[in-house]
């Protein structure tokens, strides 16, 4: 899986709930997963482009009864800006992790792969995400960014422009404490954020982007769930599927299709 580098200008300032508009095209592996309803397509989840014809998203984003397309190189979903690529998805090309159970989000395995019906054209606005090595665990407080078109606050509106928010990693030792997520969080997950900024509905499936030593970014998480008490509840960080726990499954799935 190729490595993803945003342009240097994409490193966000230190200042998605209580996030801010992203710099346009600064997260060029971010995709919008859209489903068809009454003849038009609607944003439902995020995702990350990990090969020219493969996207990783969350298992809970996929319903076998729906028709999907993926929009790449998008910034403002409401406006045609030029670099967008919209690629249809064939129904047989949705690969949800075999152990995903939508009745048990806390059981983990909330990850899916989507094969595009044609390869994306890579360029400034569309690039491949870099994935971490298998088993890689981020230290506490690693300054990662969630990106997505999720609700701006609990039950709030969906934004048109891609949002980003700084979510420091909360390590498993802290996140699994009884008054945090307790046993709901598993070692195959990553927690990030706290109470002020968080993921929200619509960010699901999108990336947790974490800095690398050489100035690039790696997608360490696939946005999975937030607290039912609200998107920015204290001691309930946003929870992500830990990508480094699923590298083997990702590579095997791509190789066999």
Swiss-Prot record:
GO terms of biological process kind: proteolysis
Glycosylation-annotated residues: 38
Keyword match Kinase: no
GO cellular component: extracellular space
One example GO MF annotation: serine-type endopeptidase activity
Keyword Oxidoreductase: no
EC number: 3.4.21.70
Catalytic activity: Preferential cleavage: Ala-|-Xaa. Does not hydrolyze elastin
Annotated keywords: Disulfide bond, Glycoprotein, Hydrolase, Protease, Serine protease, Signal, Zymogen
Active site per database record: 60, 110, 204
Propeptide residue interval(s): 3-15
Top EC class for this record: hydrolase
Signal peptide, first to last residue: 1-2
Annotated S-S bridges: 45-61, 104-107, 144-210, 175-191, 200-231
Domain Peptidase S1: 16-255
Superkingdom of origin: Eukaryota
Family per similarity comment: Belongs to the peptidase S1 family. Elastase subfamily.
Stated role: Efficient protease with alanine specificity but only little elastolytic activity.
Name of the protein described by the UniProt record: Chymotrypsin-like elastase family member 3B
Gene for this chain: CELA3B
């Amino acid at each position: 899986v190729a490595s993803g580098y945003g342009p240097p200008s994409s490193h966000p300032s230190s200042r998605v709930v209580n996030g801010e508009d992203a710099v346009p095209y600064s997260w060029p592996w971010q995709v919008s997963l859209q489903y068809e309803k009454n003849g038009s397509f609607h944003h439902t989840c995020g995702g990350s482009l990990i090969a020219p014809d493969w996207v990783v998203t969350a298992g809970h984003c996929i319903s076998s009864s729906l028709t999907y397309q993926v929009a790449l190189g998008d910034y403002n979903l409401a406006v045609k800006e030029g670099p967008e690529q919209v690629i249809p998805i064939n129904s047989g090309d949705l690969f949800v992790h075999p152990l995903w159970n939508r009745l048990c989000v806390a059981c983990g395995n909330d990850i899916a792969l989507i094969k595009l019906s044609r390869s994306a054209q890579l360029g400034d606005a569309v690039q491949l995400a870099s994935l971490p090595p298998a088993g890689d665990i981020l230290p506490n407080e690693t300054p990662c960014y969630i990106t997505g078109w999720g609700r701006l606050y609990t039950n709030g509106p969906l934004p048109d422009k891609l949002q980003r928010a700084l979510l420091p990693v909360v390590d498993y030792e802290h996140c699994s404490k009884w008054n945090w997520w307790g046993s709901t969080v598993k070692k195959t997950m990553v927690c990030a954020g706290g109470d002020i900024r968080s993921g929200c509905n619509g960010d699901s499936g999108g990336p947790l982007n974490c800095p690398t030593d050489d100035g690039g970014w790696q997608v360490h998480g696939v946005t999975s769930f937030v607290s039912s008490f609200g998107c920015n509840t204290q001691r309930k960080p946003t929870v992500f599927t830990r990508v480094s726990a699923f590298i083997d499954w990702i590579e095997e799935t791509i190789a066999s299709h």
